[in-house]
């Protein structure tokens, strides 16, 4: 349905991620044109959801990487007891743990994206795994990175809260980790669909 079609109403919605718009679409008598064969929508919808889940996983990967980078830079600039806080062992460990948690996720996102065009029989399950795993790993990194900035991490001054909110938003769009894992289990025949 073209967006300017008569009978289509678009209402902007507020959401936690102010860097991304969100809208509700209402259809009242709008003329729809089938994009595929009648009854063949399930496959097109599945592929669209899979692509969206992989894109959200990749977006989370980039957001978490940026939060780690900003935390490391902050640790070298912020001083406590006349030395950078990044020189303290506990802070070093926190940064190293964030990087170690994120690094294996790169391969998972790459493989899930690769499956979308090259290994279609694995595409849906891998999209689910990437979305669920990145949602959880990146939420943990977002929490640590925000705390690593102290009270400043919760303000507009440092900018990490934008990434924190984006990761939280991405976590729920197209299914939270629990729902996406349930979808993966159903796709693999482990539970009833």
Predicted regions and their residues:
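C-terminal helix-coil-helix/basic helical segment that borders enzyme active sites and/or dimer interfaces
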Residues: 72-83, 99-133, 146-149, 185-193
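A glycine-biased, small/acidic residue-tolerant capping/turn segment at secondary-structure junctions
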Residues: 114-116, 122, 138-164
């Amino acid at each position: 349905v073209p967006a300017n079609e008569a009978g289509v109403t678009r209402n902007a919605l507020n959401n936690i991620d102010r860097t991304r718009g969100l809208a509700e679409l209402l259809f009242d008598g709008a003329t729809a044109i089938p994009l595929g064969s009648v009854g063949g929508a399930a496959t097109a919808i599945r592929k669209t959801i899979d692509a969206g889940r992989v894109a959200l996983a990749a977006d989370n990967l980039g957001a978490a990487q940026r939060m780690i980078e900003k935390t490391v830079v902050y640790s070298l600039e912020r001083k406590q007891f006349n030395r950078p806080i990044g020189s303290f062992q506990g802070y070093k460990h926190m940064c190293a743990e964030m990087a170690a948690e994120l690094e294996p996720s790169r391969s998972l996102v790459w493989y899930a994206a690769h499956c979308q065009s090259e290994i279609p029989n694995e595409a849906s399950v891998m999209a689910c795994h990437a979305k669920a795993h990145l949602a959880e790993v990146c939420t943990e990194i977002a929490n640590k990175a925000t705390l690593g900035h102290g009270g400043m991490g919760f303000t507009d001054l440092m900018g990490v809260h934008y990434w924190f909110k984006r990761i939280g938003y991405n976590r729920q769009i197209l299914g939270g980790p629990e729902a996406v894992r349930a979808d993966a289990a159903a796709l693999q025949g482990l539970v009833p669909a």
